[in-house]
Amino acid sequence: MAAPQRSGSAALLPSANGAGRAARRTARQVPEELLNNVELREAVGALPSNYNFEIPKTIWRIRQAGAKKVALQMPEGLLMFACTIADIIERFTDAEAVVMGDVTYGACCVDDYTARALGADFLVHYGHSCLIPIDATRGLKMLYVFVDIKIDTSHFLDTIRFNFAVGSSLALVSTIQFVAAVQAASQELQSQYKVCVPQCKPLSPGEILGCTSPRLARDTDAIVYLGDGRFHLESIMIANPGIPAYRYDPYSKVFSQEHYAHDRMHGARQAAIRSAARARCWGLLLGTLGRQGSPAILQHLESRLRALGRPFVRVLLSEIFPSKLQLFDSVDAWVQIACPRLSIDWGEAFSKPLLTPYEAAVALGDIEWQQPYPMDFYASQSLGPWTANHTARPAQEKPPATPSLKKWH
């Protein structure tokens, strides 16, 4: 597409009165003496100025918690800054800093278990949203730092105006790093366009994940994604196959229309479901990379397979590779409780069907095949107990009748 050529903290109990709200503000407010600390400002100057690592807030929270060992976890794209941040923390607090170097794909990879095993009493997770609640990391204080990235929003706005007619209905989405930029852009565009910044709770407005995206109104003219890469964009494209999608890369300032092979993906996933429906022995893969695996989903699948008389084996893996699964000759079909995109994007690389929990529900007759394909893995409102945040998990004493497999042969 053409572009114009121009140069997480400790929880506080809610209160019904204003005093409670004031107390919360006081507890969360970074002291002025820390914000204005000349030495701290000089130290922060070693980090890129357009990346907000929230160093004063981090120092303040560590001091508040009285932490002695702080674990730092971040995606590989930010690891180059880890040593600098660790040095700052050790200089301005009484804590020792430990950098966790294992791969971190997303907010689902929050690794409080390893942090505790290392003896840490405080974990700072960078670059992702609060997918795992801070009160779920027992025995470990936690802080999420989104690492908001400042960009040239004027060029982004000019690009939108150059490519879309006034009055168009636009859905603006991004990853957590650019959500603030999306919000600012939506305010600027509202006078000329019908702008929507959709939300799929518990995510922030405008935020999408590779496995979780909202369904949009049918009269939406275009999806505009602000970010580099396609992984997250593909999620909302899968959830909204009839809406044209565009990507603005804030680094290269390139604006492009993006396409997705929906029919090919649907065909591949339906073929895997048909094959799995005939399987005798099932393998249940629980991802152990941080918090990727959901024990609740695992328990639900175990209950369903028992009710249907299907033998199964449980396997725990941090990362799932075809060569590893080939070692299990007796397993006829796999269900991986880790990342749905592993099956969607790479399922054909495996010799046996590798289903998502949703696809397993289809194969077992618990739900019909959905159009469009649901991208609701972490959504608060999801289709059923094969998603991570589904709360109404019905008892399985009286499971649905054993499905007819004719439609999946």
Curated annotation (Swiss-Prot):
Binding residues annotated for [4Fe-4S] cluster, in chain numbering: 108, 211, 339
GO biological process: protein histidyl modification to diphthamide
Database matches in Pfam families: Diphthamide_syn
Predominant location category: nucleus
Location(s) in or outside the cell: Nucleus; Cytoplasm
Region (Disordered): 1-22, 388-409
MF terms (GO), sorted A to Z: 2-(3-amino-3-carboxypropyl)histidine synthase activity; 4 iron, 4 sulfur cluster binding; metal ion binding
PANTHER family linked: 2-(3-AMINO-3-CARBOXYPROPYL)HISTIDINE SYNTHASE SUBUNIT 1, DIPHTHAMIDE BIOSYNTHESIS PROTEIN
Entry function: Catalyzes the first step of diphthamide biosynthesis, a post-translational modification of histidine which occurs in elongation factor 2. DPH1 and DPH2 transfer a 3-amino-3-carboxypropyl (ACP) group from S-adenosyl-L-methionine (SAM) to a histidine residue, the reaction is assisted by a reduction system comprising DPH3 and a NADH-dependent reductase.
Protein name: 2-(3-amino-3-carboxypropyl)histidine synthase subunit 1
Species whose genome carries this gene: Gallus gallus
